[in-house]
């Protein structure tokens, strides 16, 4: 082994605790990078494999009813590869020993070969026997929520008739990886399920013999999805087509794609912070090492070692530290990635997980870490090797000592001598002090981000369902029906109040921009549905014109007072120019609103409603559910409280895991920065502190001088961290914004106190470790003359 290599390993061992602290910060950065990208790659690979093996469709369309021979016309559309027609129906399910209303979607399976597209993966049990009308397959999430196994029995109200069904198999489908009820906001596995049964009995129940009301397609390579959708809409329009959609807007795929986008954002943000802090730590450690070894470096150069040789020596030392951090980070990241992926599997239902930590991710993590570390150490090393040996052998010029700015403000008499020493030392090294503050501040910021999502989601739900939508129950009809149905529901025992509504699917267009959504027709002065602005103040519903959420208005590039083209996707399909009269604020979905009477006039129809929002007496809910099951026109109902409860039960584990990970990673930064700063300060000032001990200062007083500096920097860093954290949270909220939801930048006071508390505890722990070293200073060795 070369002499310089022996020197390098000896120095690494001598400063092993500092090396460990830096390696932990690097490991945190690498871990967050590997965690995010490996989770993303694993889920993407799993999704792609599932889609391919089980023929997930690329275009979807629903309609009223079309004869089966229309399938040939659809297959003839240029760019269409495979076509499958189906019968699908929303039904009410009766679950034994479960009082709440349960909705389901029944989908037909063609006999005897099963589905061509959107095939089902059999988790347990068997497939349906051809010709059987009483057998069904059930989605795994729904089965797990109710403890169903093959052989269990449930009842479905199919077109007004009760049908007993035996569950023969538990399955998963690429079409329902993320399973959410129509009109629902959150997944509720207990109250919404997807079932599959033979086509013949399902078609007979809905007068669909030789007909279909649902069609899915795959496309030929290179085909234009937009062109196929346009031609498909033309084919199915006479049969009550509701407008075809591509895979990108299919609800399950859409939610999963948004989750992938979030992981990409995290992979971009957090590693930069961690590796930036690691770069700073390496800078101060190498700077301290180079200063301490001025004479050694000069001696080496005097004995013939080149600048390049000395430079390579310090580069190797930095590289060894990085390698330690990268290796630990890869292991940490892989473990966190697997845990994260398995956590996502609880929400997104895949049949298996193809977990992978790819070579590009590993190489990328190593290269980025090494680059950041070398950049951090570069200045100090170049400064060391550039000095002539004769100059480097001289001791460094003593630092300039003068009163601190605070002392010159007239408060000198109020400060003790040790306190003045602390302030002077901080001011004498402004760059190092500032970088320490920034490093600690970033740990506060990361902690705030970890807690922010919980704060924001709670706020989002509170605003959406506490201020905007205040119903207890949303009852949805099979199809638009007479206003008289509203009074029928009001007369149910336990119903205290109700507001009718109308839903109409539309394409909204402004110039070259368009967006597919639904206009919700509501009553002026509605008690249960309120339009609100960004200040949570009510916005009056205009008698005429359209009201849009601000997000949708931005997507369309339209402002209040301008005209929007409204293309209705059902009924007579009118196309109208409607003025935008107001903008409202919502966190969930993208909605358009109109006065219900004005919407019915736009449709050219009578006084129709699509459903009713109800305020109910909780004591009568079970009776209300039973009554609703007896009304044929009712497609189902949504209990808002149950949906919210189910959402938090599902998301609670995810939010908790995320908070724990962020706490661990942020704690590593705080400890790494504080400990290294304290150790370097101790190394630089050991002679000074030892001199004070010899002069009669007690251990506590000497510790105060050193640790007081760290305490001041930490206390200054915390409010700076609050500013960084709020900015980072605002960026995350903006980056995660989509048509599915907008996360508000809401940070609870408890988040500030928690973030500050964790950083303070981390600082105290680091301080106590350094305090032990101060207490055991070797006064004789430290005071020996270096020359």
Where are the language model's segments positioned?
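Membrane transport/envelope proteins' first extracytoplasmic loop
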Residues: 1-276, 288, 307, 464, ...
